[in-house]
């Protein structure tokens, strides 16, 4: 039996007494340890534990196996739906379909005595409905153990609501399938992850209340205040010093609100470390799930959201200043600590560094902090480095002569972090307007992760998606000495760089091969293309030139055959087609006239949107989006719909013939065609723009409770 703390033992006692228990558990307080102890104590009763994501699911399943626990199943919401209801329900769309059609289980659901709902602060309404349905369909009464940390609720933009935790006893109270109507609320405050100095910093400086306890000594929290230009060098020097002390790259997280934003330090810091041969990883998409193999033995740069549920010995938190509210959290109150920063500052087990930029007159500390710089210097749990300041200049107001606020967007940026309620609304339209062309999907085994000679793993699906079409384009042109598409994109990005920056990339570009003779050459060039576009070095540094060999001749032959069958006729020598074609650019004011006119009645007149969009292939009849991925996602469909809207808004009545818009996934051989009216596209775009730039109405507690009770 696992030895429990007093807090954990108290919770276990309430559960053994048959009560439903709701636990507010701070970061690092040992929720999994508690859950495993509950399973052992209640055996042979059966438990169903719901985890937030697949990574946590596998971690818990591993601990279940090592603890010889046989009376507990561990699932994500999607894996549970796939197992018992619909084999294709890997996404929320599938769960919505199960609820909409009230599908019955395809396999009998076992008799579970206890439902363990972990990370309840991240639950959405459809997950709540789904769990109530599972309980009803199982046909036997259940006991509830609901756990979470209301300050780790990060996914409001996806429809999550911390009230599924804080009001859990009320919203579940009338559920007919409970073994007992009695609920007990408990807390777990003792964190076994963070050190005493970190605990003091979070409680006394960030929150102004005793939210957490800790029980292990440690180094003071290092608070660094420096200019943006110097910050990268300061952090890099600190990381190198940590290596001298015995730390290794896999001990370190570098966290920020954005890993690739204009105002992020992360690009420059990654460049410095990569040039020194330090293995790094930066996710290519900021909402990417982190693959354990890919991040192993590397310094990981990540957003606050992506490291939830993870920990490392050393954590650097960038952007720990008021720029966070200016650029990343415009709608949040500035006098309260955002959950994102609380999560970021509770990931470390040994050393925590927080970094405040001091570059401009308007830069200032986070307003919710309860201590000034001078007060921080007086604390034994803080090591303050930099020039303290007490008086700050208010940010200058916008020039009243130029009242227009312009938002610059790409389709990828537009669809990032859209509220779940908006996505749910849009999904119904997408299901209707995209039509499948051709037969059943046929998945081709194309490696998405490769292993280097140094034993590192690298994500290469982005390189496949660039190289494979370019190989085909050159084949269509009868073979060419160089890939004109890739070279053009690389050269465009190189020309945009300042003369005094990115010498490493410029030197590589100077040595590009004159002839592209193999898939290896194309993959190498694809990696260079990504590097010069993103201005990140790590993947070029970590894949040796001799290792671009994961695409076999048989795979390439099958890809060629598929592209021949789908796009070959439209790309014949007698046809006109354009590769990597920019359909609209943010600087083209004329192209945005109709967009401004259409959006004027839906947004404040001082708000304008400027789009930049580039499509993979434009033929005489079709605008093609080409993918090489395991499945076509909702995001992919949205991108095509956005392209179609931008195309029609740009051309207006000048279009002589309407282009077809299609998406072709080379890996699965799927083709989907867009069959939408301009009204459909307008509806989608308005929903996306309003979801991203207009604050959503929040239900009152009374409305929230009523909606939940009605659903169960």
Predicted regions and their residues:
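Domain-level recognition of nuclease-like catalytic cores that cleave nucleotide substrates
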Residues: 369-379, 660-712
């Amino acid at each position: 039996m696992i030895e429990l703390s007093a807090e954990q033992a108290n919770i276990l006692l309430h559960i053994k007494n048959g009560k439903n228990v709701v636990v507010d558990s701070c970061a690092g307080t040992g929720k999994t340890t508690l859950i495993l102890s509950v399973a052992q104590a209640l055996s042979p009763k059966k438990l169903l534990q719901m985890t937030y994501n697949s990574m946590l699911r596998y971690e818990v399943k591993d601990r279940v196996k090592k603890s010889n626990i046989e009376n507990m199943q561990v699932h994500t919401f999607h894996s549970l739906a796939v197992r018992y209801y619909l084999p294709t329900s890997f996404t929320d769309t599938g769960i919505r379909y199960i609820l909409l059609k009230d599908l019955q289980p395809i396999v009998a659901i076992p008799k579970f005595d206890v439902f363990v709902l972990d990370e309840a602060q991240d639950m959405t309404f459809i997950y709540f409905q789904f769990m109530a349905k599972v309980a009803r369909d199982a046909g036997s009464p259940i006991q509830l153990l609901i756990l979470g940390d209301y300050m780790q609720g990060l996914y409001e933009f996806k429809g999550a609501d911390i009230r599924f935790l804080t009001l859990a006893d009320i919203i579940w109270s009338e559920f007919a399938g409970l073994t007992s109507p009695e609920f007990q609320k408990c807390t777990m405050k003792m964190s076994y992850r963070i050190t005493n100095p970190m605990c003091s910093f979070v409680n006394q400086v960030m929150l102004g209340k005793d939210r957490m306890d800790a029980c292990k000594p440690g180094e003071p929290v290092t608070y660094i205040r420096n200019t943006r230009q110097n910050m990268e060098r300061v952090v890099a020097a600190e990381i190198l010093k940590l290596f001298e002390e015995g730390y290794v790259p896999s001990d370190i997280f570098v966290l920020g609100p954005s890993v690739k934003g204009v105002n992020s330090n992360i690009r420059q810091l990654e460049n410095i470390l990569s040039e020194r041969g330090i293995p790094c990883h930066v996710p290519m998409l900021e909402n990417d799930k982190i693959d354990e193999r890919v991040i192993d033995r590397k310094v990981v740069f990540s957003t606050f959201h992506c490291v939830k549920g993870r920990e490392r010995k050393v954590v650097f938190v960038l952007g720990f200043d008021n720029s966070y509210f200016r650029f990343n959290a415009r709608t949040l109150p500035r006098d309260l600590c955002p959950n994102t920063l609380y999560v970021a500052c509770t990931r470390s087990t040994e050393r925590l560094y927080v970094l405040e930029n001091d570059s401009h007159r308007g830069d200032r500390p986070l307003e919710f902090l309860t201590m000034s710089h001078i007060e921080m210097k007086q604390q034994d749990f803080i090591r303050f480095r930099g020039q303290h300041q007490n008086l700050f200049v208010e940010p200058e107001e916008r020039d009243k002569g130029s009242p227009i606020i312009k938002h610059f967007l790409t389709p990828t940026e537009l669809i990032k972090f859209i509220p779940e309620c908006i996505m749910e609304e849009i999904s119904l339209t997408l299901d209707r307007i995209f039509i499948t062309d051709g037969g059943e999907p046929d998945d081709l085994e194309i490696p998405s992760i490769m292993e280097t000679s140094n034993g590192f793993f690298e994500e290469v699906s982005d390189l496949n998606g660039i190289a494979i079409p370019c190989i085909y384009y050159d084949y269509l042109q009868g073979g060419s000495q160089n890939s004109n598409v890739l070279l053009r994109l690389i050269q465009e990005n190189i020309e945009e760089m300042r003369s005094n920056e990115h010498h490493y990339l410029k030197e590589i570009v100077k040595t590009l091969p004159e002839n592209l003779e193999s898939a290896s050459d194309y993959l190498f060039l694809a990696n260079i293309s990504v590097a010069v576009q993103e201005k990140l070095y790590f993947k070029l540094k970590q894949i040796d030139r001799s290792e671009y060999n994961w695409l076999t001749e048989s795979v390439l032959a099958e890809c060629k055959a598929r592209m021949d069958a789908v796009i070959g006729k439209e790309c014949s020598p007698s046809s006109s087609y354009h590769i990597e074609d920019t359909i609209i650019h943010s600087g083209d004011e004329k192209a945005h006239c109709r967009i401004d006119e259409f959006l004027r009645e839906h947004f404040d007149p001082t708000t304008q949107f400027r789009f930049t969009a580039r499509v993979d292939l434009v033929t005489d009849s079709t605008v093609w989006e080409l993918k090489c991925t395991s499945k076509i996602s909702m995001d992919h469909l949205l991108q095509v719909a956005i392209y179609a809207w931008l195309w029609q808004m740009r051309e207006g009545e000048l279009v002589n013939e309407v282009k077809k818009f299609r998406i072709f996934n080379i890996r699965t051989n799927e083709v989907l065609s867009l069959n939408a009216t301009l009204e459909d596209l307008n509806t989608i775009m308005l929903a996306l723009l309003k979801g991203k730039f207009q604050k959503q109405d929040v239900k009152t507690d009374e409305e929230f409770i009523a909606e939940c009770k009605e659903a169960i």
